Amino acid sequence: RASVKQVLNVDKRTPSVLAIARSDRLKDSDRHPHEIANNTDFASLLSGERSSWFCNDIDNYPHYKSTSVSRGYKSTIVWPVLTRVAAEDLMGTFAEDGAGYKPIVAFLCLDSAVPGIFNEEQHVPLGWAVSDALARLYEAQRSFWEPDISIESSK
């Protein structure tokens, strides 16, 4: 499965994500924001600890956290969608990368119910190409990606 999760940073203290696109049907749990701090993959990307998240066996990853009620996946790859536009022009949140801040506006997520399904050397670079294309689309059509405020405020 593939999904795009928009970063919401309404109050700057509790950044969260909201699923805005999925390869399968959106579930009810996708219709409300999930705090980034409670999701190991998003938190590690936002903190700059990793540039992408790759895990072929989530069940055996120590202290893995996810706010997805019924996760249903065993393997996952997550890429940040990074834009090149000025930070003040973007909705989103920012991760320290050592040389300044990088705007993370969304996450591209790929997961599978099968453990060990992904090949890091092949799939991670391919995902970066898709993530970069999403970032260019986001820069060009920001309003297309803006979440429905009624969904966000019903939290």
Where are these regions (language model features)?
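Amphipathic alpha-helical coiled-coil segments that mediate homodimerization
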Residues: 1-4, 130
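Surface-exposed beta-strand edges and their flanking turn/coil or helix-capping segments
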Residues: 31-35, 67-70, 91-92, 119-125, ...
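Short acidic, S/G/P-rich loop/turn micro-motifs used as interaction or catalytic elements
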Residues: 61, 84-85, 113-118
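Juxtadomain coupling helices with adjacent low-complexity linkers
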Residues: 100-155
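Short loop/turn segments at strand-loop or loop-helix junctions that form parts
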Residues: 7, 80-81, 110-112
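Regulatory sensory and allosteric helical modules in signal-transduction proteins
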Residues: 3-77
